[in-house]
Every structure is written in structure tokens, then in C-alpha cells.
Amino acid sequence: MDIINMLDEKFKNIFKRHYENVFFSPGRVNLIGEHTDYNGGHVFPCALTIGTYGLVARRNDNKVLAYSLNFDNLGVIEFSLDDLKKCKKDDWANYVKGVIDTFNKHGHNIENGFEILFYGSIPNGSGLSSSASIEVLTGIILNDLFKLNINMVEIVKMCQEAENSFIGVNCGIMDQFSIGMGKKDCAILLDCSTLEYSYSKLNMTGYKIVIANTNKKRGLADSKYNERRSECEAALKELQKVKNINSLGELTEAEFEELKDIISDPVKLRRARHAVYENQRTLKAVVSLNNNDLKTFGKLMNESHISLRDDYEVTGIELDTLVSLALESKGVIGSRMTGAGFGGCTVSIVKEDYVDEFIESIKAKYTEKIGYEPSFYIVNIADGAKKIN
């Protein structure tokens, strides 16, 4: 618990008193099922042992004082519960504001302020959901602090709403759901249209999940994420003229092939094809994992990346370089981009004995080609967000 002692010292230095409670919210990695969540499809994410810590103490007034060790230079960000508007100078604390504002709108009134210290071990902008981790962390803190008695699925939904309506990023439910509902050593098969979910045990004996970060600067809100979403919505509208469906995730591959010529724009056709095929790939991948067939699972991961590169066009030279170098390496059974894309991370399944060699070799070759180093994390699968003292 050394990290908690370190954070306690920081809390005392900044707020001149002890914290009352400490919470942890994981990051997440999606093993397969990318850009399917807002298309009514399935995703297969898991929560990680890296994440965000939150130390908190209540106040008697209506002020919130927030400090992040990851944004030291911004100091303490102070705002009033009477003025929960998004503003640029409040930077990362807008995520906290957004969750409070959304709780209020749902009738869970937050009437007291608090002091909060955040520390995240998830690299910002890595695509491992540092923003959703902060949102869910804020949600469970509010739930505990004000004894609101809200179940985790409702917290998750409100956190997604905060990101959509307050922050302005049109994300699906996957990030917040996997962070709130994660389970140690399991991945979650989530149907994003119904929120039905089931856990699959990850039997990784002899293998490791290795995440490689491109370290490319990226911003989700101003990336092409919203553009992809509207392209899929436009394709869906055309398909709805001939078939009674609510989302692309309802179509099988065969149904899509039969109907695809209805989509007049070739770009929108490619976007829709990815959404349909990726959803089916995800379902096949879960079956293979449940049968302990890691080889097929890896093959489907590779196919997922190709589709994200060619049909969805969200990869870029950095992610493509990491994946192609991974697939040339010994002991790798699957590799793909994970997250929204446009930078961020890849996830690879690597034989344990080859992990060091994998990292050294890719680091050197990527740096030579791209001009700066990637970072690597060997991750374990964790429980969802929770109070830890």
C-alpha cells in the first residue's frame, strides 16, 4: 500500500488534512469489438490493474477542490456546485463536473463540496480510457460520499451521459461499463444495444497481454471519432429503407452482403461493413476463448485490425507499424489496435517466454521508423471500480 501512503502525504500537503476515503477505478482494454459499441454490437473488454486513485474528504460548503498529480502544473482546480459549466481552464476537472451535473439532473442532488486528489497510472491519451476511469471514479465517490445507493450499471450509464452531453464526445457505453463492471481475470461480453453481459474467464496460462502505446499525441473529442459515428448512422438509415433494423449490430454477414448495394456511398459502405463484420468476429472470438482456442482468438484479433485499417480507416502509420512489427515477432498469436484509434495503443497476446524480446525488438524498430519511442505495459485483468480502504 506504499502508493496510498504517498498519496496521503500529497493530500495533506495540498489540503492540510487527512483524506477520509480512498477509491480506485481501473483503465480498460478492449480485446476485440472496436467501434461496435455505438453501432449496437458486441464488445469484449476487460478492466486493468492500472487505473486512477481518488482520495477524498467532504467539505461543509458547496465548493469542490480538485487536484491531479498527473496535471501538477494546473494546481488545485476549484469550482462551485452552483456553477457546473464546462470551461476550458478547468481542463481534466470538467470530467468531474460533468458527472456531478449528470447526477444532479437525475435527481441525485450533490449538495456538499469535497476535496479530491487524483492520481492515474494510465497514460493520458493512450486510448486506455483515462477519461472514463476518472468519470466512473467520480461516480462511485459521489455514490459513497452521499449515500445515494445507486447500482453500478446506473452509475455507468450516467458517466457515459456525462461524456456525451457535458464533454461532447459521442462515445458508446463500453469504456464506462467495463471500468465499472470489470471482474478479475475475466473479460466481459457486452451487448451494447441491450446491456446484457456475461463474463468469460481469460485462461492465459503461458501468455501475457502486452499493450504498446504509440505515444502519438491525440485528442478524442476533436478526432474523427464523431465523423465515423455519423457515417455509420447514414449507412444505417439507407439500410432501414429495406430492412426493419435498429442498428448495424443486428445484421449477420450474409444479410449485409445481400443488402449492401443499398448504401450509395462507397465510404459509408466500408464503415458499415466493418461494424457488421467486427460484431460477428467478436462473437466468434468469445466462443474460441471459451473453448480455450487462443490461436483462433489471435487470428480474429488480426482480422479486426485489418478491418479497422482498411474499412474503418482509424489506424494510421504508428498503430500499423506496431501491429506489423508484432506479427513479425516470435511468440505472438494476435495483435490489433485497441480503443478509438488515431494513435493510442495496440494489444497483443504474446508467449510469456518471448515478452522481453518482443518489447526490445519492437521498441528499436518502431523508434527507427517513427522517430520516437513507444511504451509497453504488461497488464493483468482487474476488478471494476471500488472503494479500497
Curated annotation (Swiss-Prot):
EC main group: transferase
Catalysed conversion reaction: alpha-D-galactose + ATP = alpha-D-galactose 1-phosphate + ADP + H(+)
Site (Transition state stabilizer): 28
InterPro entries: Galactokinase (IPR000705), Galactokinase_bac (IPR022963), Galactokinase_CS (IPR019741), GalKase_N (IPR019539), GHMP_kinase_C_dom (IPR013750), GHMP_kinase_C_sf (IPR036554), GHMP_kinase_N_dom (IPR006204), GHMP_knse_ATP-bd_CS (IPR006203)
Pathway field: Carbohydrate metabolism; galactose metabolism
Binding residues for ATP: 68, 125-131
Residue sites binding Mg(2+) per the record: 131, 163
Family: Belongs to the GHMP kinase family. GalK subfamily.
Name by which UniProt lists this protein: Galactokinase
Organism: Clostridium acetobutylicum (strain ATCC 824 / DSM 792 / JCM 1419 / IAM 19013 / LMG 5710 / NBRC 13948 / NRRL B-527 / VKM B-1787 / 2291 / W)
Lineage of the species this protein comes from: Bacteria, Bacillati, Bacillota, Clostridia, Eubacteriales
